[in-house]
Amino acid sequence: MEFPFDVDALLPERITVLDQHLRPPARRPGTTTPARVDLQQQIMTIVDELGKASAKAQHLPAPITSASRMQSNRHVMYILKDTSARPAGKGAIVGFLKVGYKKLFVLDDREAHNEVEPLCILDFYIHESLQRHGHGRELFQHMLQKERVEPHQLAIDRPSQKLLKFLNKHYNLETTVPQVNNFVIFEGFFAHQHPPARKLPPKRAEGDIKPYSSSDRESGLPQGW
């Protein structure tokens, strides 16, 4: 994906990591430096255009990634640059991966509710002309190392069939734990939670009231709370 400004100078590294501040990375020594506000506007343009491209590829009604969404959430965006593409010396973008921690209520394999806060895959896009060249795995692997997580510890928001196949091919993630929300988790998710998942007390059947102990009566709270 190409832009009218110098992507190669704006993003010096092959993979750039952006947070909610969308600050331009440090420039290489010897390069001219436009006003910082102009650089941030260029960053925002890249984020917006990548979000639109991802939404189009996934047939979504609207982008789920944009500069404004990034600024209002504590998400992290990994952007992969094509170091070999230099149209007019400006470089190009291969794709991106967006992640973030979210508090979720998920079911384990015994259908017990668990309150967890895993790292979630929120959006993932590689330009159509550059797929099946190892770029997706390179980007995903960089994120795993940077965030210090294992693939089975992730929760994925509304994954496409293409993403599920990608995870199966590269990370042997196949068996999912059925959920009632839009997130997908895989077998092994609960075995490696850190911090540990907090289990919620099972819902009591109507009329099944547990007797109070003396200490419970003194505290005014039913046993188990």
Curated annotation (Swiss-Prot):
Acetyl-CoA binds at residues 124-137, 160-169. Component of the BBSome complex. Interacts with AP2 alpha-adaptins, including AP2A2, but not with AP1 gamma-adaptin (AP1G1/AP1G2); this interaction is required for efficient alpha-tubulin acetylation, hence clathrin-coated pits are sites of microtubule acetylation. CDD domains: NAT_SF (cd04301). Its main location: cytoplasm. It is an enzyme of class 2 (transferase). Specifically acetylates 'Lys-40' in alpha-tubulin on the lumenal side of microtubules. Promotes microtubule destabilization and accelerates microtubule dynamics; this activity may be independent of acetylation activity. Acetylates alpha-tubulin with a slow enzymatic rate, due to a catalytic site that is not optimized for acetyl transfer. Enters the microtubule through each end and diffuses quickly throughout the lumen of microtubules. The keyword Membrane applies. One of its GO terms (molecular function) is tubulin N-acetyltransferase activity. Residues 203-219 have a biased composition (Basic and acidic residues). This is Alpha-tubulin N-acetyltransferase 1. Residues 1-190 form the N-acetyltransferase domain. GO terms for biological process: alpha-tubulin acetylation; microtubule cytoskeleton organization; neuron development; regulation of microtubule cytoskeleton organization. The record marks Q58 as: Crucial for catalytic activity.
